[in-house]
Amino acid sequence: MQKSLITKWLFISCIMVIAMIVIGGITRLTGSGLSIVEWRPVTGILPPFSFESWQAEFAKYKAFPEYNSINYGMTLSQFKFIYLLEFVHRLLGRITALIYIVPLIYFYFKDVIKNRDILPYIIALLLFCVQGFMGWYMVKSGLLNSPSVSHFRLAFHLIIAVIIYHILFYQLIKNRCDILLIPSQTDLKLPLIFSGIAITVIYVQIFLGAMVAGLDAGLIYNSFPLMGDNFIPMEIKDNFFNLANLHDPVFIQFIHRLGGYSVFLVVVVLVICLLKIEHPKLNKIAYFLMIALLMQISTGIITLLYSVPIIIASIHQLFAIILLSIIIWCYFIIKTS
């Protein structure tokens, strides 16, 4: 009974974090992230209701660079749309934190979660706190001189969410999955190594994807597999190893493409390793991996070719989490077998 409660709680928490990641991506893609120019963790739980309240929020927004540089002349109705998207994102963040924290306190004091098992839950709790601050720290970067947020802060904001999800999902499968019985003579070293490498490469790729979004780098070189007429674009060919390139949309898009090739190669090798073991459960994971990988690659290419359509770009982001989840599941099964 207690194990079932923990499993349900962790499952709901994981779904909420995924929803936060996807809605956060939509907020970025629609240019809604800078519409709320204040950080009010407690008093900001309700949106404006009266016409006067909306006018007051709109007046605050008009005082910052995004309105004057990008959205000058925006109507109140248009402002309401971007405001409510950002509001939903922030509200969902609060709800997600409560869904995680309140049961955690209950489970701990009821001794459902033992002291020996509490550490990952505490780390996730601390990361929830850091994430709230990081979200505002990111937004603040777009309220100064530039009408866009720092792509570095955006990437860290996303990666913290992914780490939180990783911790919760790992605890979920730890509570839910049985240990797989594999013959002792089976060599699991290679699939364990490549599942670890795959997790690392996907983390890097998610970070780069956030930087692409932050720099609007998906709106340039909308061709594949070449960038224009070249594999390496001319703008960076002669100046590749320069730290200034980390602010260059062309360079970041190119590196993100390389990351995609890396993910493909590593996951394909992992799939081959799993299929060679000839175990039904691991073979099933291999098939799931290939489906998720193909979906991730195809949505990424479509996102690029069609200049970042919001729905496809959101699905692309979602499948990054799905692909990561399957590999974490794979890693857990191999490690505990």
From Swiss-Prot:
Q: What is its EC number?
A: 1.17.99.9
Q: Transmembrane residues, as ranges?
A: 6-26, 93-113, 118-138, 154-174, 192-212, 258-278, 285-305, 308-328
Give the GO molecular function terms.
metal ion binding; oxidoreductase activity, acting on NAD(P)H, heme protein as acceptor
Q: Which GO terms describe its biological process?
A: heme A biosynthetic process
Q: How does it sit in the membrane?
A: Multi-pass membrane protein
Lineage top rank: taxon = Bacteria
The cofactor required is: heme b
Q: Pathway involvement?
A: Porphyrin-containing compound metabolism; heme A biosynthesis; heme A from heme O: step 1/1
Localization of this protein: Cell membrane
Return the InterPro entries for the record. COX15/CtaA_fam, HemeA_Synthase_type2
Q: Which GO terms describe its cellular component?
A: plasma membrane
Record bears the keyword Iron: yes
Pfam families membership: COX15-CtaA
Question: Major location, coarse class?
Answer: membrane
Keywords linked to the UniProt accession: Cell membrane, Heme biosynthesis, Iron, Membrane, Metal-binding, Oxidoreductase, Transmembrane, Transmembrane helix
Q: Which reaction does it catalyse?
A: Fe(II)-heme o + 2 A + H2O = Fe(II)-heme a + 2 AH2
For heme, which residues are the binding ones? H256, H316
Q: Which family does it belong to?
A: Belongs to the COX15/CtaA family. Type 2 subfamily.
What the protein does comes down to: Catalyzes the conversion of heme O to heme A by two successive hydroxylations of the methyl group at C8. The first hydroxylation forms heme I, the second hydroxylation results in an unstable dihydroxymethyl group, which spontaneously dehydrates, resulting in the formyl group of heme A.
According to the record's subunit comment, the protein's assembly and interactions are: Interacts with CtaB.
State the protein's name: Heme A synthase
Task: Specify the species.
Answer: Rickettsia felis (strain ATCC VR-1525 / URRWXCal2)
UniProt lists the gene as: ctaA
